[in-house]
Amino acid sequence: MKMPKAIGLVHFIGIGGIGMSGIAEVLHNLGHRVQGSDQADSANVQRLRDKGIEVFVGHTADNLGDAEVVVVSTAIKKNNPELIAAREKHLPIVRRAEMLAELMRFRNAIAIGGTHGKTTTTSMVATLLEAGNLDPTVINGGIINAYGTNARMGEGEWMVVEADESDGTFLKLPADVAVITNIDPEHLDHYGNFDAVRAAFRQFVENVPFYGFGVMCLDHPEVQALVGRIEDRKVITYGENPQADVRFSNVRIDGTRSIFDVEIRRRRTGKIFSFKDLVLPMPGRHNVSNATAAIAVANRLGISEADIKKGLASFAGVKRRFTLTGEANGVQVFDDYGHHPVEIKAVLAAAREACKGRIIAVHQPHRYSRLSSLFDDFAHCFNDADTILLAPVYAAGEDPIEGASSEALVSAIKAAGHRDARFLEKREDLASQVAAIANPGDFVVLLGAGNITQWAAALPSELKSISGKSE
């Protein structure tokens, strides 16, 4: 039985979250009555209001109104007054992943999983399916620049979703195609140990039906090891590895574009198809790898080489994924969500390939627990930056942990051999410090999952003010 239309008013607690907002938008577009609440106004909240969805700011029991279903994410605490009121009324409480799973039952579904690269890969798959006239429905974990939103309602039979592994609920998603970009030891607060993370990703792929398939990155050692353990399901491998079914090669970086070739090998027939000089308007091998995953999916769904090339060339990117926020005096400023050492290393490597000048990295560590558990990795992930400015930790509600501070990380980075790592004590000092060291042709890359995105948006105009120039 699929979810009926007559389920009554659906209330989202925390509707402004990136995952919740996309589900709410698609439900609304399907004709359901939707409302919600969030603790603060935001761009996501305003976007939902613009679409006719009522959103309350603040959490009170009265916000429920005549709601008949309540949707919550794992971020909502048990003492939330709306959640308490919903339980007192004996309303159905639906977890975010469960509601996403219900939406997926209306379509053939592609779920993109992995510790890093999910949002970009989801966007790329959606772009290629759209280029192939499959008109997909999309629910992503980031704002797709071409849509101006993280959700899209299509008329086609396919849905593309980002599968969030952080709390294990991605195993509820009924995917026909499961993509794994990589597997790293993240979210151990939920899983307990890395073996449990490995087991979850194995289940993610083995959950696909017999007529579905997995798409797995052979360049990542954990994913490669998992490929050999998958039983009774079709798997397509991709990557730079010569053994991959869909292999990219001949990567050339041209400014902020990547140009590369892809070779597709059919295991059953041995046939080989070659796509030459694919153009992706993003730098970096990690983005080429993500694009290759999308190509593997699109090719298997019958999308032509011409449409794949057209779709890739038109890809407009994702908000906060190496996003240019402005330029001041020849210095370009970029905003990126990277907050894990693997992500930071990949972004800075891409910047190094694209930049003719120097790289100035500004990082705001996100959560004391992450900095503490990955401290050594953080100390070695900034090598492609010429200068590093480390802001205080964005706590995200956590208490400090001894030894897990930005000052300690600066010392560790220097001890690892980096020549120029500095502590940025106050946000107000950012523009003056950058202005003192940046020259025309340099890139300033701001990285983090906290409020550093606001710094990135403001920095170009602040740099212009310091130089006395304005446009």
UniProtKB/Swiss-Prot annotation:
The keyword Cell division applies. Keywords: ATP-binding, Cell cycle, Cell division, Cell shape, Cell wall biogenesis/degradation, Cytoplasm, Ligase, Nucleotide-binding, Peptidoglycan synthesis. SUPFAM superfamilies: MurCD N-terminal domain, MurD-like peptide ligases, catalytic domain, MurD-like peptide ligases, peptide-binding domain. It is an enzyme of class 6 (ligase). It is found in: Cytoplasm. Gene3D superfamilies: Mur ligase, C-terminal domain, Mur-like, catalytic domain, NAD(P)-binding Rossmann-like Domain. Its EC number is 6.3.2.8. InterPro entries: Mur-like_cat_sf, Mur_ligase_C, Mur_ligase_C_dom_sf, Mur_ligase_cen, Mur_ligase_N, MurCDEF_pg_biosynth, UDP-N-AcMur_Ala_ligase_MurC. PANTHER family: UDP-N-ACETYLMURAMATE--L-ALANINE LIGASE, UDP-N-ACETYLMURAMATE--L-ALANINE LIGASE-RELATED. This is UDP-N-acetylmuramate--L-alanine ligase. The lineage of its organism: Bacteria, Pseudomonadati, Pseudomonadota, Alphaproteobacteria, Hyphomicrobiales. The gene is murC.
